[in-house]
């Protein structure tokens, strides 16, 4: 404890130019990490595309096989019988495939290297924090990364395939054939992946607000019904097929985030009336 306090004290005595030099070295390390990862992913990109990014185009993708095993009737469970066909992508612009390989390498380097980037930044600011602040920041770092990757996993294995199948097979008229471009596919893929990664950061945000006393458990007890309704609406918008089964499997993880967030808020009295969590629950 004394060593950590002395480290914090000594960091406060560092000159401005020394801090600037440390920041420069930190940014240089971050750039090296991202460049190395980007080059590695650029080399491996053909395999990553075939076995990861384009996997939802295949009829053998796990969620399609699950619905096929259940036997969708189109009413309660989506009918994905047409999913026996692979979704074909086309490229209509010269150089698009090369640019897609380069941009995807950069995006993947950011996603995979994000924990390393945060860790290097953490090493830079750590000497200026108190021990209690360090422990809180360390928990937030680990928890935030886990939730971000969990959100992307849910989007990849569940949300994106359902949206892809629906939009790829939807027809305004039989005279209009769907021809999906590579750009359109990649834009939708990254949008959904990153969106759900950020959505799953909600528990971390709630935890931080709870630590600062901005939000309490009474809030979750009071607005639980509103949360259920809002999550159902969001799940209905995300689930284009509209069947109850797809709606439920999208609704379940989203609503679980709400309840999980409530558990992260510290117990105690409310700011506005001093009511305890038990009295708020009794009112609900």
Please place each PLM-identified region on the residue numbering.
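Membrane topogenic/interface segments and analogous intrinsically disordered interaction regions
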Residues: 1-284
């Amino acid at each position: 404890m004394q060593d950590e306090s002395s480290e914090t004290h000594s960091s406060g005595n560092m000159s401005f130019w020394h801090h600037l030099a440390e920041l420069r070295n930190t940014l240089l390390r971050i750039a090296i990490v991202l460049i190395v990862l980007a080059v590695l992913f650029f080399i491996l990109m053909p395999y990553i595309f075939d076995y990861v990014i384009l996997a939802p185009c295949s009829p053998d993708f796990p969620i399609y096989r699950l619905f096929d095993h259940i036997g969708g009737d189109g009413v309660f469970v989506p009918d994905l019988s047409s999913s026996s066909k692979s979704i074909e992508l086309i490229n209509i612009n010269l150089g698009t495939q090369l640019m897609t390989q380069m941009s995807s390498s950069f995006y993947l380097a950011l996603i995979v290297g994000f924990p390393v980037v945060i860790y290097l930044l953490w090493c830079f600011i750590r000497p200026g924090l108190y021990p209690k602040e360090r422990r809180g920041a360390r928990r937030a770092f680990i928890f935030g990364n886990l939730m971000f990757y969990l959100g992307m996993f849910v989007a990849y294995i569940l949300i994106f395939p359902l949206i892809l199948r629906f939009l790829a097979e939807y027809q305004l008229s039989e005279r209009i054939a769907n021809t999906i471009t590579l750009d359109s596919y990649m834009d939708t893929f990254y949008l959904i992946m990153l969106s759900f990664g950020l959505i799953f950061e909600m528990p971390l945000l709630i935890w931080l607000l709870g630590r600062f006393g901005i939000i309490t458990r009474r809030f979750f007890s009071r607005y639980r019904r509103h949360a259920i309704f809002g999550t159902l609406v969001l799940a209905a918008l995300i689930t284009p097929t509209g069947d109850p089964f797809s709606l439920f499997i999208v609704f379940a993880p989203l609503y679980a985030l709400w309840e999980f967030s409530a558990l992260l808020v510290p117990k105690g009295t409310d700011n506005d009336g001093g009511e305890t969590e038990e009295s708020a629950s009794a009112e609900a």
